[in-house]
Amino acid sequence: LERIRFDPAVDRLWFCGDLVNRGGQSLETLRLIHSLAIHSTIVLGNHDLSLLAISTRREADQRKVNPDLQRVLFADDTEILISWLRRQKLVHVDRTLGFAMVHAGLAPKWTLTLAEARAREVEEKLQGDGFFKLVKNMFGDKPAWGTKLTGFDRQRAITHMAEQKKKKK
């Protein structure tokens, strides 16, 4: 932040997911970004979603993940950080600035408005009572997106579509 001369009075930082499990300082990264509060905008990446899922597992299973993630999972402020991550978005659109941010790309057929609406479906589960069931069923490549999908199949497909990289033809 010193190098870029970050000034919280005028600057806002945008973080494009994968806040954890990159570079070996996940706990420090989360704490720093959390401390920036209103001076930052975040979208979740697949690594962040994985951390949320791991955070719901039994302690014995959490101890099997890499040491970097273990430091997050067993930190004194884990509950605060996990709760804060759960409140972040999958898609952020700033219409005033004319910019949008997602972690890795959007489904080619989705408009930003549609992407926001679909992302909100998953975000509501992340933030609400459906969190534990969502993260248990969130991962996997199937089914492919279809407008007739419902329940966890739909949420899994939305998460995948909001996190996928556009494939070259």
Annotate each language-model stretch with its function:
Residues 141-169:
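Conserved, helical-rich catalytic subdomain that frames metal- and/or nucleotide-binding sites
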Residues 1-36:
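N-terminal active-site segment of His-dependent metallophosphoesterases
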Residues 27-30, 34-151:
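Active-site neighborhood of divalent metal-dependent phosphoester bond hydrolases
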